[in-house]
Design a protein with these regions (language model features):
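A short, N-terminal "cap"/entry segment at the start of jelly-roll beta-barrel domains
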Residues: 1-50
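Ligand-binding loop in jelly-roll beta-barrel domains
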Residues: 88-111
């Protein structure tokens, strides 16, 4: 039987970043689920690049705004909005706010 040992940890989802690229911070990885905080300051997916992940993804915008593009159109996300992206749903980030920075909470999982 596999056991996971967790220790009490504290963090702040709104800790400022000073980077020139998106910042990805893994908060939890356990079995079939992982949670990340992503901070984007005006960053977008490279031209022609599409995510095609083998995991489902729940993503919520905690601060700022963003726009995702799928093969079926664009989805605007403002602070408090979330979207559930099925595995292998091709998508890309076409906009993120820079002031304030876009802070995402992403939960990934496998069936």
């Amino acid at each position: 039987m596999r056991r996971y040992i967790y220790i009490l940890q504290k963090g702040n989802l709104f800790t400022p970043v000073t980077r020139t690229d998106d910042e990805f911070v893994e908060i939890l990885k356990s079995g079939q689920v992982r949670i990340e905080r992503i901070v984007s300051e005006g960053h977008v997916s490279p031209p022609g690049f599409w995510y095609d992940q083998n995991e489902w993804e729940y993503v919520a915008v905690l601060q700022g705004s963003a726009e995702l593009e799928t093969l079926n159109g664009k989805i605007r996300l403002d602070s408090g909005d979330w979207v559930m992206i099925p595995a292998h749903e091709k998508h890309r980030v076409s906009y993120t706010s820079s002031e304030p920075p876009c802070v995402w909470l992403a939960v990934f999982g496998k069936e």
